[in-house]
Amino acid sequence: MFELVDNVPQSAVIKVIGVGGGGGNAVNHMAATSIEGIEFICANTDAQALKNITARTVLQLGSGVTKGLGAGANPEVGREAAMEDRERIAEVLQGTDMVFITTGMGGGTGTGAAPVIAEVAKGLGILTVAVVTRPFPFEGRKRMQVAEEGIRLLAEHVDSLITIPNEKLLTILGKDASLLSAFAKADDVLAGAVRGISDIIKLSGMINVDFADVKTVMSEMGMAMMGTGFASGPNRAREATEAAIRNPLLEDVHLQGARGILVNITAGPDLSLGEYSDVGNIIEQFASDQAMVKVGTVIDPDMRDELHVTVVATGLGTRADKPMKVVDNTLQPAGAAAAAPAVPRGDQTVNYKDYERPTVQRQSHAASATAAKINPQDDLDYLDIPAFLRRQAD
């Protein structure tokens, strides 16, 4: 007797949970932009704020703690509220393969509750990725300190953490931008990060990257970044990849030595083997030797000339394999740093007789000593760094 077996692959269940006011705004924005195949959840202590949410599932946290009010910018209240409803959080996340936790760090509910939600998700075996923003500078030093502590706690309970500093928006939008447009752009960036990663999973392509690949690259990796680049013309592959890597809206993290890398190339039928190779070669230059690299392609028949590249790099900060050498090319007066003997470090000692020599003699001696120590190999090592990354370092 034959038994019919359903061999149709099941799509990964992906959910996005926005926590607090900032997370709720981001979820509303994502739902409006029609990111397909994702279920949206909003969690907040403020019952009034939840009334304006369009997400399919809303979760009021800690009604016994806050009585339906907000957390009053107190992360401890947000944490207690989430702890009160741990079972309900687990219930709405049940059966999920991957969850994005998004919030604006620095407030009460988002900062306090997000680590608790992440801990619950991880306990259920869910691939847990947080995409959060740091406050704008004008929001105050106190809020920034609260955000930093919240990010530290959140990092302990997620597989990968993408941090987006709102300060970068000021550089891009300019100081004349309205407050509403600034916060709307922050929501755009959060939505873009979620869409970029989910599309890698959801969109099938000629060279496919599936959920298992994403899980391998993003599990237990810590600090991560996500960037997208678009380009057209004869050098579109290289330009799009470099644009994705140096995305100005992402945190200032060192890409050198990334341990996990996901790349998705989306282009029309005219995508060439050489362009595919160009993308891979650029990625290889900043990946560690042991990095898990997955490059997928999606052919969109409607695309003409333009090429899109999405890069997700994880496990950042471990750069032992290919250390990045930063060279300071800032011109300084000769011997300026040698006007006084160097401050001792470790077991070094100061020769106080040096102070008896005129400054001009000390400077001349220091300049000669520095010239004698120049190692030509240093310059050769520097050339191992991709040109566009050297320009960033300079």
Swiss-Prot record:
Belongs to the FtsZ family. SMART domains: Tubulin, Tubulin_C. GO terms for biological process: division septum assembly; FtsZ-dependent cytokinesis; protein polymerization. Homodimer. Polymerizes to form a dynamic ring structure in a strictly GTP-dependent manner. Interacts directly with several other division proteins. One of its GO terms (molecular function) is GTP binding. Keywords: Cell cycle, Cell division, Cytoplasm, GTP-binding, Nucleotide-binding, Septation. InterPro entries: Cell_div_FtsZ, Cell_div_FtsZ_CS, FtsZ/CetZ, FtsZ_C, Tub_FtsZ_C, Tubulin/FtsZ-like_C, Tubulin/FtsZ_2-layer-sand-dom, Tubulin/FtsZ_GTPase_sf. It comes from Azotobacter vinelandii. It is found in: Cytoplasm. GO terms for cellular component: cell division site; cytoplasm. Essential cell division protein that forms a contractile ring structure (Z ring) at the future cell division site. The regulation of the ring assembly controls the timing and the location of cell division. One of the functions of the FtsZ ring is to recruit other cell division proteins to the septum to produce a new cell wall between the dividing cells. Binds GTP and shows GTPase activity. This is Cell division protein FtsZ.
